[in-house]
């Protein structure tokens, strides 16, 4: 089922008549030597896609891959946004689609 916004044309989105959107929120931070730094994003996005495939009219918004992870500052290459920037990204994302669909977050 074609429901991933970033893989669709504007025409396909319009024809799909989406009424709901799910946004996965992850991170890119250290999880030890055995798990990818992006596992939070990968799991949240996979679940979002599985949910959307089961719910009529649900669109999958591209994942938000970096969030507030200041508690991982001591680990190399853990990416973080400031708290205020994280809130601003979430707010702006919501504002972009709020008038068109019901929004569901998955983290």
Question: Which residues does each predicted region cover?
Answer:
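N-terminal catalytic or cofactor-binding beta/alpha core of small enzyme domains
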Residues: 1-103
């Amino acid at each position: 089922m074609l429901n991933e916004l970033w893989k669709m044309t504007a025409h396909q989105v319009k024809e799909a008549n989406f009424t709901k959107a799910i946004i996965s929120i992850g991170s890119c931070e250290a999880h030890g030597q055995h798990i990818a730094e992006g596992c939070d994003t990968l799991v949240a996005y996979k679940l979002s896609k599985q949910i959307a495939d089961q719910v009529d009219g649900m669109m999958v918004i591209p994942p938000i891959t970096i969030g507030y992870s200041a508690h991982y500052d001591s680990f190399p290459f853990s990416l973080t946004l400031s708290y205020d920037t994280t809130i601003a990204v979430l707010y702006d994302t919501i504002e972009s689609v709020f008038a068109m669909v019901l929004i569901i977050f998955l983290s």
